[in-house]
Amino acid sequence: MTKLPYALLDKGSLLVASPDVNGGIFSRSVVLLCEHSPNGSFGLILNKILEIDSPEEIFPLDHFDESKVRFCMGGPLQANQIMLLHTSPDSANSSIEICPSVFLGGDFSFAGEKEGRTRDDKMLLCFGYSGWQGGQLEKEFLEGLWFLAPSSQEIIFTDAPERMWSDVLQHLGGRFASLSTIPENLLLN
């Protein structure tokens, strides 16, 4: 995996928080950039997992393998809004493809489709989103608060989201790989 240059800041890129982003929701975050334009940007944090006591009250899991449905904190904005990231090509007409085989949006109706079998689709239900005003993300990027990496379905829907930050940095290689080993609490070093 190679680091993407700043000019490739675009939909489908991963924003990887620098270790300098210390504290708060963006500390060690990996954000999937879902939209980027001169007017602003928005993305979803992928690796801040939420434990939900009764997920069936939020989303019908009847036809899904629960191990393939994850809940996460998408960002600090509108935390009561749910954004759906998924791999279901069945809902491609009502969704936006963010990167190959990863879709954003659509309604939950595809959950009831193909009754009688367990679906293999993977899903992230993200509470809230992350947003930047025009020029803000570029400024943060130039200040070294974010690194840019390519995304893939495998990274987005990893079975180990708690390791996503360090795994992506490891794959970037070089100095990024060494950054992945910095402990979260430097006092424990």
UniProtKB/Swiss-Prot annotation:
Pfam families, per database record: DUF179
Cysteine pairings via disulfide bonds: none
GO cellular component: cytosol
Stored Gene3D superfamilies: VC0467-like (3.40.1740.10)
Coiled-coil annotated spans: none
Domain of life of the source: Bacteria
Family: Belongs to the UPF0301 (AlgH) family.
NCBIfam families cross-referenced by the UniProt entry: PRK00228.2-3
PANTHER family, per the entry: UNCHARACTERIZED PROTEIN YQGE, UPF0301 PROTEIN YQGE
Full protein name: UPF0301 protein CTL0463
Species of provenance: Chlamydia trachomatis serovar L2 (strain ATCC VR-902B / DSM 19102 / 434/Bu)
